[in-house]
Design a protein with these regions (language model features):
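Non-catalytic interaction/regulatory segments
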Residues: 94, 264-277, 290-344, 543-832
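Structured, charged N-terminal subsegments at the starts of enzyme catalytic cores
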Residues: 256, 319-388, 395
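Conserved catalytic core of two-metal-ion nucleotidyltransferases
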Residues: 44-52, 58, 67-70, 108-164, ...
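Acidic/His-rich, divalent-metal-binding segments that scaffold phosphate/diphosphate chemistry
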Residues: 13-27, 31, 41-62, 66, ...
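Active-site nucleotide-donor binding segment shared across nucleotidyl transfer reactions
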Residues: 52-104, 109
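Long, amphipathic alpha-helical stalk/connector segments used for oligomerization, subunit docking
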Residues: 149-196, 200-202, 541-544, 551-552, ...
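Divalent metal-dependent catalytic cores for phosphoryl transfer on phosphate-bearing substrates
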Residues: 85-94, 98-110, 470-599
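Conserved nucleotidyltransferase catalytic core and NTase-mimicking acidic/glycine-rich helix/loop elements
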Residues: 3, 10, 176-320
Length: 832
């Protein structure tokens, strides 16, 4: 009979366990049913029910049909720690206290032992502590961990009378050495004058603004006054709306933590979590914002709020328990005109100071000395509570500009960021607030990165760059500071080209601040190209003339170059300080110096500027947009600037298509009005031989352009044409001549000394040869034969004959041979 009962009990325990395992397997469905809302309360209720089932079954096993009433059996199961505070996620441990009263009438220790073993084998994650009610105070009064875990208890099952006795004992240990307990939990929030930057991939439990901070806050609130609820304690320093906002943030973080537990078995949110959790939580996108950024932005915003609110409540309620080290006279001296207090470089605001109008708040901040202050959490919350009206905000924005006139703007801007007021004063920053960037480079969110950029601007360590900044006028420094803060405002709006979007946004906002038109125009260029200097220095050949002139042509003048150099330093450091190393600094400095010198060559700068404009036109061309991305990139790597000067966007695209598909030399002949030969090649050709053979057709125009991947485009236009039946033979002759290894020796033309100009140092990469002479048959064949004989590579050429005069321009690739044989070129070409 006893064996049958034991088997039956065992079977009942197994059924409870199976039910739990089924419940656990279906947790994702339970979560998605309400999109994770109130999921922590759902978990607590379900776990409570399983514990009750196990207790009821154990009671039946021990007492059979004589089960005593709950209150008659001196045993209770109480939730402690985060389980009691309902701070649960799917992977949470369940901390419980099994409490009993040692009575002679029951063999309760034997019951406790078996019940504990049953719970341990249940498959649930229990952390069990056992205590005898009369021994709680003596055993645990100095145990800060136990005092923390039991600072809030929640009855699950068992004797309620015993539960009330336990609460009385817990109140006693709370009162014992209360300051030590408060200090223990306050450490989690210190210092109150430093709000950390948010990690983009935070641990939702232990990270800044995570669940552990809520736990520490609850422990503090539960200790302050046992007769007052946690909510009532918080209401002493916060209003209903603020508490409701705080609770929503907590609930979202707990839901997100469960989503991470259920989908990836982790407590840490990472770049890889974004898509998975977004889909799992069925997060919907907002206007101009994709689904992926919504969830990370909401998470980081919630963590920021939890961190700010928790610190404010903890500081406000705990400070009265600790005597100030300042004397009355010292406190009096620390008080400022605006009602703030400045103590050891930290700004404090009394709790009783009423919230200010937004325009008055800005003036109060401007009254502070131009010093790199820190702002206590009391000051942050005072800023957060500013009263905002439409007219008041307009007045505040007009005064807000003055913050940028200060040498130490960062401290105030950081306090406005922490109070989430910066996006109200700078509306364009609203969509980048707590916007994460999972690109492998950015350490912080977009808004924090922007504020941090200002910090690096005001604390430049590079002496050379610091001197450049010191040389700026006040308006230049002010404009650059605003640009530095707003350089990324184009992000988060759904477009790929955040720099151009940001430049347009800056223009509109800068007009509100009444910056001069010149300052606004420069600011627009800086934001439009704020990544350019870094990209060029790291990814391109900064010793290439083409690269340098393409770079500076976008900037326009030396002053913009200087400002961009300073801005690049700040942005790179704010992205991740490890990125600005000695190598990066050297590249940026060299790019700056080379570019500064290049501004003196106005002709080449004008050529490069025209190229940039043509490139912009190509980018908008529908034919270009239809090309493969690889070919699009190749077009902008065309070496010759002259291609962009001479040809239309469509013509450049067509040239590039042919060159891209080229396997060997291709020749195209047109004979409509006169003979025209187009040659595409990826190897050296005997062009002088072709010109020798075709001299009778009278060359009128020739151009040679280097395209990309060492491919060349050559065009020859003659004054004469050929008979149509001779076209095929003409093409065969052209190909034969080009591939010939025979060096022809055309008759030397008459070129006077004053008709030729050779610039060996035209640029770092190229020498330039110009000929302006009388047109003579075979002249170009002879010139090209000289180049072939001396093994010089022509990268660009333009030859035109007008009114019996031939005007020739050649760009020749510089090398040691060219530098040593410069005089020989002239001797071979000049007939005198």
């Amino acid at each position: 009979m006893l064996a049958d009962k034991s088997a039956k009990n065992s079977d009942n325990y197994s059924k409870i366990k199976e039910k739990f395992l089924d419940f656990k397997a279906n947790l994702p469905k339970h979560f998605q049913k309400n999109q994770g809302r109130n999921f922590t309360n759902f978990l607590a209720k379900e776990y409570d029910d399983f514990i009750k089932s196990y207790l009821n079954e154990t009671m039946r096993e021990f007492f059979d049909e004589f089960v005593p009433q709950n209150d008659s059996f001196a045993f209770s199961v109480l939730a402690t720690s985060k389980y009691a505070q309902t701070l649960l996620s799917a992977n949470s441990e369940l901390e419980i206290l099994l409490v009993y009263k040692n009575l002679k009438g029951y063999n309760i220790k034997n019951f406790l032992k078996e019940f504990s073993e049953i719970l341990d084998s249940s498959g649930m994650k229990f952390v069990i502590k056992i205590a005898e009610v009369d021994e709680i105070f003596i055993n645990f009064k100095d145990d800060l961990k136990f005092k923390s875990e039991t600072s809030q208890l929640r009855y699950i099952c068992g004797s309620k009378s015993l539960y009330r006795l336990v609460k009385s004992e817990i109140i006693k240990i709370k009162e014992f050495d209360k300051k030590a307990f408060l200090n223990y939990h306050l450490k989690a929030f210190l210092p109150f004058s430093s709000i950390s930057y948010l990690a983009q991939e935070p641990n939702l439990k232990s990270g800044f603004g995570g669940i552990d901070e809520i736990y520490h806050l609850n422990c503090i609130l539960n200790c302050l006054d046992s007769d007052v609820s946690v909510r009532s304690q918080a209401l002493k320093v916060m209003n209903e709306k603020e508490i409701a906002s705080f609770n929503l943030n907590v609930d979202f973080l707990l839901s997100l933590l469960s989503a991470l537990n259920l989908t990836q078995n982790t407590d840490t949110f990472s770049a890889s979590s974004v898509e998975i959790t977004t889909n799992f939580m069925q997060t919907k996108s907002k206007k101009l914002q994709d689904n992926e950024s919504v969830i990370s932005q909401k998470m980081l915003s919630s963590m920021n709020n939890v961190a700010i609110y928790s610190r404010f409540i903890a500081a406000s309620l705990c400070r009265p328990f600790f005597k100030s080290e300042l004397s009355f006279e010292q406190r009096k001296f620390a008080r400022l005109k605006n009602g703030f207090y400045e103590i050891n470089g930290v700004i404090y605001v009394p709790l009783h100071k009423k919230p200010a109008l937004i325009e008055d708040l800005i003036n109060e901040l401007l009254e502070l000395k131009d010093v790199d202050y820190k702002f206590d959490i009391s000051a942050i919350f005072y800023i957060k509570r500013a009263i905002i009206t439409k007219d008041g905000l307009e007045r505040a924005i007009s005064e807000f500009k003055k913050i940028f006139l200060r040498e130490n703007s960062y401290a105030i801007l950081k306090s406005l960021l922490d109070a989430q007021m910066i996006q109200i004063l700078i509306k364009p920053m609203e969509h980048i607030s707590q916007l994460a960037e999972y690109d492998g480079y950015h350490e912080f969110t977009v808004d924090e990165h922007s504020i941090l950029s200002v910090k690096f601007l005001e604390n430049i360590k590079d002496k050379f760059i610091k001197n450049l900044y010191a040389e700026l006028c006040l308006e230049g420094k002010t404009m650059l500071k605003i640009v530095t803060l707003m350089h990324d405002v184009g992000k988060g709006l759904g477009g790929k080209d955040h720099a151009n979007i940001g430049a347009n946004i800056f223009r509109a906002y800068a007009n509100k601040l009444n910056l001069s038109q010149k300052a606004i125009n420069i600011g627009v260029i800086l934001i439009k190209y704020h990544t350019l200097m870094s990209n060029v220095s790291n990814r391109e050949d900064i010793y290439s003339q083409r690269v340098i002139f393409a770079f500076i042509s976008k900037l326009g003048d030396k002053q913009v170059l200087k400002l961009l150099y300073i801005l690049s330093y700040c942005v790179i450091n704010a992205t991740n300080e490890r990125l600005y190393n000695a190598y990066t600094a050297k590249l940026l400095r060299e790019l700056y110096e080379i570019s500064l010198s290049a501004f003196s060559d106005e002709n080449l700068l004008d050529e490069a500027t025209r190229r940039v404009k043509k490139e912009q036109s190509i980018k908008r061309n529908s034919e270009f947009l239809a090309l493969e991305p690889k070919l699009q990139e190749k077009i902008f790597k065309i070496t010759s600037n002259l291609v962009f000067t001479k040809y239309s966007a469509s013509e450049i695209i067509n040239l590039s298509k042919v060159a891209d598909s080229l396997n060997e030399t291709e020749i195209f002949i047109n004979n409509t009005k006169n003979l025209s030969i187009q040659i595409y090649t990826n190897k050296s050709l005997n062009l002088s031989a072709l010109l020798y053979e075709f001299a009778k057709f009278d060359l009128a125009y020739m151009e040679i352009f280097e395209l990309f991947e060492k491919k060349f485009y050559i065009r020859l236009d003659f004054n004469q044409n050929v008979k149509n039946h001779e076209l095929e033979n003409t093409k065969i002759l052209a190909l034969k001549s080009l591939n010939s290894e025979v060096l022809r020796e055309p008759l030397k033309p008459n070129i006077n000394k004053d008709e030729i100009n050779f610039e060996l140092n035209h640029s770092k990469d190229y020498a330039k040869l110009s000929i302006n002479a009388k047109d003579q048959r075979g002249l170009m064949a002879y010139v090209m034969s000289v180049f072939d004989r001396l093994h010089f590579q022509v990268t660009s050429a333009r030859i035109q004959t007008v009114k019996n005069r031939t005007r020739n321009l050649f760009l020749i690739e510089k090398n040691e041979r060219l530098e040593s044989k410069g005089e020989e070129i002239l001797n071979l070409l000049i007939s005198e």
